[in-house]
């Protein structure tokens, strides 16, 4: 029989009051409206004129853009964090959907800025990047320029941005909701998917086995739907990559990570060429666990003494103390 040890965190929920008091907080709507108005004003002031800006003027523009984005980021993060605590609350989901749509509208107002920076002549861009006034944003400017071969025209970028609301982001949210709704029946108790997954780290092998079987059973219903959602997200990315002209499916990620396709491929080759290391590791782990052969539910089994149980209050003090 699986027993869940109380930690003191059973009724603990995120305190999001540093962002907003609630979904009805008037400050939330004020911030959204301010962001919308500021984005429109930003476009009115700078659209078509980025190439004419001095280093100081470009710094002012970047700072204003950061201010606009930081205000809206606070609102959208609040909505997502609040929704993550209860994905069955339709009101919370509606707030996420509304702000996601508003975010796309704001992005279409601001996206010209990056496009015009990317379009600067190399000599002018290099001079701006080298200026002391833009030292803080030097890496960001170089990153924007690095993506120059893969950006589309502004009308095309606007279409992709607005379509993303009903495209990738919508499918991604649906997948999270489907996964979050899964309940696992373990030893007569119904628990959440994440809690059930945590049982796979138990030192009790029989509990790991029962948990694994229960998780497999719970994942059965809706499997085809989740697979379809996942595949749709993958296809959406492949279309985006094709339109932008990326060489491989991972090229955009490599570029964002400041690395190259060649470097990542070398890493992949090094790992796949030494699968024997993983085999040796699991052989050793089986021996340390006193087993002739590992089962799939033994992969995350702890080694050594039983894991230390830490109460919520102690864990909270430990983490907060680390940031003091």
Task: Tell where the protein language model's regions lie, with residue ranges.
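A well-structured
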Residues: 1-323
